[in-house]
From Swiss-Prot:
Bias type Basic and acidic residues, positions: 208-228
Zinc finger (C2H2-type) residue numbers: 79-101, 107-129, 135-158, 366-388, 394-418
Gene3D superfamilies for this protein: Classic Zinc Finger
Name by which UniProt lists this protein: Zinc finger protein Pegasus
Gene Ontology cellular-component terms listed: nucleus
Positions of the UniProt region annotated as Disordered: 203-255, 310-360
Subunit structure: Probably self-associates.
Homology family: Belongs to the Ikaros C2H2-type zinc-finger protein family.
Length: 419
């Protein structure tokens, strides 16, 4: 009963002395500058501030380890985080990053319990209270308060990817140059005919169906009208092509200067949009229906090549008697050069006096007797004839598929089944 229990104050003093001894021991090992200070002075500073500030190490030998504003710099001058390997050049960014480790959220909303470590997050949150929506979609009336929501809306609603227009135009020109370099290869031209989707085609119909051609041209792409305008001016003015192409945009000029092999690939797909032989073509009330008459297709030649002679058909009121042609090219080989007769478009026998006489050069055109297509180039003609079978002209020479007629044969290649 005579023993006295130690007072709590004595226990706190003993624990503080123990902490001071451990602190001095650590400072001696690390060579810190704080070791020069007395333990009493250190305890006084801790008592006044209530916080233990980290030591500021100054290394004069290694400049990469110097501390600026309490942050260590790396060898390339960036500020390094003391908790991880993150480094940045901006002090404000590093302070925001350190708040991830410390959990500090100094930016608080005065209307609700929301708090954030980033000021920009608080600004976006305040728009939910004010109702402000500064970000608007340029394709619809959608508005939002955050830019990330607008990006999500564009991807989900309009299927738009974050791609710049300048880069897409550059990649288009690069792809065009590659196609022009590879266009000299015969095998590559065949692959273009089979695989590429057609952008446009020049179409020539009888005069009885000219009023229906206007409805067909509305469905063509914009650059198809450029080709049509250049083709119509061939027989009138040699400079018509240059003026027609010069009036278009830069992208239209690139399409007009494309390789002729690329233009050949446009033929198969456009044939699919033309009615089959079983369906009667629409005619005007005052014109006669010609069941044996077929439209004539012409594959355009590039602008740099000599201008092709325009092919004009007689008016629908005058019947057309085509010259007899063999049903199959018996003397032709699919892989050999020109082997079909070079013919010209027949003119009407009893045409009206005001009808212009067709002007054409048989040496410029190569005719396919099966598909009724005229080619201004021997290479284009050879590639096309190589797709026909030897025994059966409507049998695919690549996969052996048998087609019923020229329409079915063109649709077979338009499906793009050959890889």
């Amino acid at each position: 009963m005579g023993e006295e229990k130690p007072e709590p104050l004595d226990f706190v003093k003993d624990f503080q002395e123990y902490l001071s001894q451990q602190t001095q021991h650590v400072n001696m090992i690390s060579g810190s500058v704080i070791g020069v200070k007395d333990s009493d002075d250190l305890q006084g500073e801790l008592a006044q501030n209530g916080l233990e500030h980290p030591a500021v190490d100054m290394s004069l030998e290694d400049s990469s380890g110097m501390l600026v504003d309490g942050f260590e710099r790396t060898y390339d001058g960036k500020l390094k985080c003391r908790y991880c390997n993150y480094a940045t050049r901006g002090t404000a960014r590093l302070i925001e990053h350190i708040r991830i480790h410390t959990g500090e959220k100094p930016h608080r909303c005065h209307l609700c319990p929301f708090a954030s470590a980033y000021e920009r997050h608080l600004e976006a949150h305040m728009r939910s209270h004010t109702g402000e929506k500064p970000y608007k979609c340029e394709l619809c009336s959608f508005r939002c308060s955050d830019r990330s929501n607008l990006s999500h809306h564009r991807r989900r609603r309009h299927k738009l990817l974050p791609m710049k227009g300048a880069r897409s135009a550059l990649s288009h020109r690069k792809m065009l140059s590659v196609l022009q370099k590879r266009g000299n290869s015969l095998g590559y031209g065949r692959r273009l005919l089979i695989n590429l989707s057609p952008p446009s085609m020049v179409l020539q119909k009888p005069s009885s169906e000219q009023h229906h051609l206007g409805d067909f041209t509305h469905d063509l792409p914009p650059h198809a009208h450029l080709h049509q305008e250049a083709y119509n001016g061939l027989g009138k003015d040699p400079q018509a092509i240059g003026g027609a192409i010069g009036s278009g945009s830069r992208e239209d000029q690139d399409m007009a200067l494309d390789n002729p092999l690329n233009q050949l690939s446009t033929l198969a797909g456009q044939l699919a949009s033309i009615p089959s032989e079983a369906e009667g073509a629409p005619v005007s009330p005052g014109a006669e229906s010609l069941p044996d008459e077929k439209p004539t297709f012409l594959v355009q030649q590039p602008v740099t090549a000599p201008a092709a002679v325009s092919v004009n058909t007689a008016q629908a009121s005058s019947p057309i008697t085509p010259e007899p042609r063999p049903a199959a090219h018996s003397g032709c080989s699919p892989g050999v050069g020109p082997c079909s007769e070079r013919t010209s478009t027949p003119s009407g026998t009893n045409s009206q006096p005001g009808t212009p006489t067709p002007v054409q050069d048989p040496q410029m055109l190569h005719h396919c007797p099966h598909c009724h297509i005229y080619f201004p180039d021997n290479i284009l003609y050879t590639i096309h004839m190589g797709c026909h079978g030897y025994e059966n002209p409507f049998q695919c020479n690549i996969c052996g598929h048998r087609c019923r007629n020229s329409y079915d044969f063109a649709c077979h290649f338009a499906r793009g089944q050959h890889k």
